[in-house]
């Protein structure tokens, strides 16, 4: 049983992938909460409840924005590590999501300093549905990746 750089990459990826799974689950829960608050706060009769709901929506979007850069940077780190370890199959599996993250990062609104998840935009039914589907797809990808990294870590530790 030899400890190689590839085994280290898989171990670190396994731990960080657990964090990405947590991020994806948090996104799903947040979008589900936004879906329950889908009615426009202006439509409500009581202005106190409307302001309270609007603050809740802004708080959720603020927290979602805080998770975007760590998620993108962790996934970029995966790709750099697997490139350095010359794990081509694993790199090939991660590159499509990395390109999607780059596309998403560079196509955010130019006038906002935040990355995404602006409250009025997210509360659009189509955007909210898209974001929720994206979160479910990322959760599936990260779960499959987790078990793939676990298998590859064991394989590299045993085969070396």
From Swiss-Prot:
Residues 1-10, 94-138 are cytoplasmic. Residues 32-72, 160 are lumenal. One of its GO terms (cellular component) is dendrite. The keyword Transmembrane helix applies. GO terms for biological process: neurotransmitter receptor localization to postsynaptic specialization membrane; regulation of AMPA receptor activity; regulation of membrane potential; synaptic transmission, glutamatergic; vesicle-mediated transport. It is found in: Postsynaptic cell membrane. Regulates the trafficking and gating properties of AMPA-selective glutamate receptors (AMPARs). Promotes their targeting to the cell membrane and synapses and modulates their gating properties by regulating their rates of activation, deactivation and desensitization. Keywords: Cell membrane, Membrane, Postsynaptic cell membrane, Synapse, Transmembrane, Transmembrane helix. Belongs to the cornichon family. Its main location: membrane. InterPro entries: Cornichon, Cornichon_conserved. The chain crosses the membrane at residues 11-31, 73-93, 139-159. One of its GO terms (molecular function) is signaling receptor binding. Brain. Expressed in the neocortex, hippocampal formation, and cerebellum (at protein level). Acts as an auxiliary subunit for AMPA-selective glutamate receptors (AMPARs). Found in a complex with GRIA1, GRIA2, GRIA3, GRIA4, CNIH2, CACNG2, CACNG3, CACNG4, CACNG5, CACNG7 and CACNG8. This is Protein cornichon homolog 3. It comes from the Eukaryota. The gene is Cnih3. It is a multi-pass membrane protein. The keyword Iron-sulfur does not apply. Pfam families: Cornichon.
């Amino acid at each position: 049983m030899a400890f190689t750089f590839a085994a280290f990459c898989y171990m670190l990826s396994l731990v960080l992938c657990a964090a990405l799974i947590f991020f994806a689950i948090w996104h799903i829960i947040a979008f589900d909460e936004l879906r329950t608050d889908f009615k426009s706060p202006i439509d409500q009769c009581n202005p106190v409840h409307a302001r309270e709901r609007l603050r809740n929506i802004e708080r959720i979007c603020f927290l979602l924005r805080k998770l975007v850069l760590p998620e993108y940077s962790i996934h970029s780190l995966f790709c750099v590590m697997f490139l350095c370890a010359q794990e081509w199959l694993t790199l090939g599996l991660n590159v499509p999501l990395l390109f999607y993250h780059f596309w998403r990062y560079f196509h955010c609104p130019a006038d906002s300093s935040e990355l995404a998840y602006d409250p009025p935009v997210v509360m659009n039914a189509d955007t909210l549905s898209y974001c929720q589907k994206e979160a479910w797809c990322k959760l599936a990808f990260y779960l499959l990746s987790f078990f793939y990294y676990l298998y590859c870590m064991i394989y590299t530790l045993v085969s070396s």
